[in-house]
Amino acid sequence: MGVTIRNRNYDHGSLPFLQSLLAILLVTTTTLHINGVEAFHEIHYNLQSVGAENVKQVHRTGYHFQPKQNWINDPNGPMYYKGVYHLFYQYNPKGAVWGNIVWAHSVSTDLINWTPLEPAIFPSKPFDKYGCRSGSATILPGNKPVILYTGIVEGPPKNVQVQNYAIPANLSDPYLRKWIKPDNNPLVVANNGENATAFRDPTTAWLDKSGHWKMLVGSKRNRRGIAYLYRSKDFIKWTKAKHPIHSQANTGMWECPDFFPVSLKGLNGLDTSVTGESVKHVLKVSLDLTRYEYYTVGTYLTDKDRYIPDNTSVDGWAGLRYDYGNFYASKTFFDPSKNRRILWGWANESDSTAHDVAKGWAGIQLIPRTLWLDPSGKQLMQWPIEELETLRGSKVKFSRKQDLSKGILVEVKGITAAQADVEVTFSFKSLAKREPFDPKWLEYDAEKICSLKGSTVQGGVGPFGLLTLASEKLEEYTPVFFRVFKAQNTHKVLMCSDATRSSLKEGLYRPSFAGFVDVDLATDKKISLRSLIDNSVVESFGAKGKTCISSRVYPTLAVYENAHLYVFNNGSETITVENLDAWSMKKPLRMN
């Protein structure tokens, strides 16, 4: 492997480059960009059925899930059935903007290579005449899959929502090519106490010890986010519980709720129906107000059908997230073949609608992740599925430890830096040079601090990390880095994925995504980082998956063979690269 050392002082005046069964909300409004993800799906009636003459390949991902062309959004109803993984997803078969939505359907035996099938669900009945929105899959006894999804029974402006089900036409077909929507739909309608225009996203159902099936539906009342609970003995006749399983003031519409158990010990996942003293439960909601996903770990009181979050994290906007970047509308499922819980999440584009139409596609599914509970019991851990490693190609590694003093860049050569997987561990000798954490920053979120203290702002312990998708002269780059602050009687570790200098292209949304990492550096003085780099997306996992950040970026110079990868340090404390392994990533043999 070749190594290039550049002595760079990241000062703002020093270099030229430093000067530059999940429902979808149907709202016809001007697009609001909140934290980089559209707050409402932008409705372009004149573009919904405009197909691309030529699908442009620049910025298309090499190993992420996406169809050949057109728009995709929420992952729907993921499941494992008779040796086959299924992923349904919201898809516009006619264009690269939101509209004409159907449940597209792809199958795989390894979660890497995907074969597209005909759409499984599309508007065709009175109970979904105006739309088939997101939902979940449940495996009933006897290995019988059923899909719960939201149907739209009145068009704009009301968009009245009901909950429907669909069943396979042929259970002997492992690909489940054809689905039937029985005429006894809808199963659940909003009553007088519920908001029928904000009533969607049925979860995977679970079976309690009394023999009742239970599911959640997301909603809101004024600004209070709500997860309503429904019970059924036969999966057909559903009764609303007297109270929601959980709600929270000032959180707005709870989209895409997900509710599942996690084991207190070990990495194994659990079937959704598991309860008992050896498990905690996770409630995840996607907040329409912020377009981020939040979760809590807590206790499910089965006798009262109440969920009580632990007091180890905030229950609301300032709470834990699966991902602190471009990640939304997620859905998990239990994979019995490997006893794991797998998370799917959608990343939309940060480019303009005009560019989406011109290139002929929009949206990707991020790499599936395995979820488990951290030994502390306070948060989840996430890691890319092990199957991803089958795509690793040529490998480079540092043959020895590499010390990085302030301003040093070390280039990682010998791989395709535009399409790579890199794992690195950083260490340092002392925390003495930590910068003080300004008390007024407590009023800010992590993104604000990252925008103030970016990779070019010299610090004490950090910033240090990776420069991904970098051009040769560093006119473009996307840094993923850590910065350690001294807080009262402790330290705070900030992790950033900063798209500010990711592209010279005008009109892009270039956020400074960030989150804090709950890790004790006082004793070990080490922290790890893994980044999956794929042309227009960088997925990063800090501290073995404690904090995750995904960014969509669109370099103009750092594309294909012109992309570079570096490790860097811009803090006064010398940082040591303990080890670094990087791989070129191959394309799957089949991607839709």
UniProtKB/Swiss-Prot annotation:
GO terms (molecular function) for this protein are: beta-fructofuranosidase activity
Enumerate the propeptide ranges: 40-48
Q: What does UniProt list as catalytic?
A: 74
| Protein EC | 3.2.1.26
* Nucleotide-binding recorded as keyword: no
Cite the PROSITE patterns for this sequence.
GLYCOSYL_HYDROL_F32
Write the protein's name. Answer: Beta-fructofuranosidase, insoluble isoenzyme 1
Organism, scientific name: Daucus carota (Wild carrot)
Gene transcribed to yield this protein = INV1
